[in-house]
Amino acid sequence: MESDNLQDPQEETLTCSICQGIFMNPVYLKCGHKFCEACLLLFQEDIKFPAYCPMCMQPFNQEYINDISLKKQVSIVRKKRLMEYLNSEEHKCVTHKAKKMIFCDKSKILLCHLCSDSQEHSGHTHCSIDVAVQEKMEELLKHMDSLWRRLKIQQNYVEKERRTTLWWLKSMKLREEVIKRVYGKQCPPLSEERDQHIECLRHQSNTTLEELRKSEATIVHERNQLTEVYRELMTMSQRPYQELLVQDLDDLFRRSKLAAKLDMPQGMIPRLRAHSIPGLTARLNSFRVKISFKHSIMFGYTSLRPFDIRLLHESTSLDSAETHRVSWGKKSFSRGKYYWEVDLKDYRRWTVGVCKDPWLRGRSYVATPTDLFLECLRKDDHYILITRIGGEHYIEKPVGQVGVFLDCEGGYVSFVDVAKSSLILSYSPGTFHCAVRPFFSAVYT
């Protein structure tokens, strides 16, 4: 490492405390400590949030600032060392006692002007050392940049898989509680069916959890392969220029290109299979009401995104050419229990639920904190179900009618897959305490 030659106190400040090499793309934290950007992020890749400074252990939430001034200082110092090396007597040409200011790319050696004109090096590609250093560093940094972009994407996949695992554990625990509550309201009691349902839920939960962990391990393995090659490139980029020039980097560059072309596993999408609850739809039909919708609005774009869904699913996009319809019930409900069904088989994206007082901003519907929705969106090549309670839900997408059960006294809403007589999900009791009205929005296919 070039840091071995740092004796001057001022030059010691150019050494990264993580890799012990000269800074590459230096950044500094709020606490004042400085590191190579890659070193800092690679150091944090397996550490749970919040991230912390490797020197003082102060949390920094992965916020840092690029130190442009220090980067310039590093460049100046490295060039200064190269010139000191070239000007030293011990590194002059032994034959001609002249400075070696020319680089032979074929032989990978430094030459003086007279040696470069000799018969031995005729036909070889020569250039000044400054140009050779610049070209070598540009090629190194190009490979590093390519791998770094893939590393960041891969790290995002790792973090996403870990979040998915945590949410899966949490959602399965909550779902078990909801299932017990639903069975508790069935008449007559279905204790045996409830126990079988919960046993099936736990089995699927554990099986999926194992698959999620295997998926994470696969992603981590691929990321580590990229990291290994990246560290080699970074180590080479920190070598003194005079050493860097004479290195044969063809094999390293070849492995870098192969690593950059590796397929990146993106993690799995868990799905909870629908499980029928005997008598569920029959019981809910005792609260059946006919809902009349009004104020149906047709437009090519809607900002309907309850709970800022774009922040949770940034890859979810809207097509401005699509036709949206937003409708809400003529009547609001503040007491009692009500159940209605919405036929969704002809829609690829839809939202059902209840809202307080629908209002428009321009030609768009704007959701409020009291709105309780179940929303189906297309994300990449699959569908997701989302709600205000935690974002995405890993539940099998209903293909026909969705039932909506509103309990005003309990202050919650439940959604049912009518065809399979299964619970999609349910908001917790006490979620709202106001009059609400049915809501429906869809995108035409």
UniProtKB/Swiss-Prot annotation:
Highest taxon in the source lineage:
Eukaryota
Q: Which UniProt keywords apply?
A: Metal-binding, Zinc, Zinc-finger
Where are the B box-type-classified zinc fingers? 88-129
- What InterPro entries does this protein's entry cite? B30.2/SPRY (IPR001870), B30.2/SPRY_sf (IPR043136), Butyrophylin_SPRY (IPR003879), ConA-like_dom_sf (IPR013320), SPRY_dom (IPR003877), TRIM/RBCC (IPR050143), Znf_B-box (IPR000315), Znf_C3HC4_RING-type (IPR018957)
Q: Name one GO molecular function term.
A: zinc ion binding
Q: Where are the zinc fingers (RING-type)?
A: 16-57
Which segments constitute the B30.2/SPRY domain?
Answer: 271-445
The record, for CDD domains, names: RING-HC_MmTRIM43-like
Binding positions (Zn(2+)): C93, H96, C115, H121
Q: Which PANTHER family match?
A: E3 UBIQUITIN-PROTEIN LIGASE TRIM
Q: Which family does it belong to?
A: Belongs to the TRIM/RBCC family.
Q: What is this protein called?
A: Tripartite motif-containing protein 43B
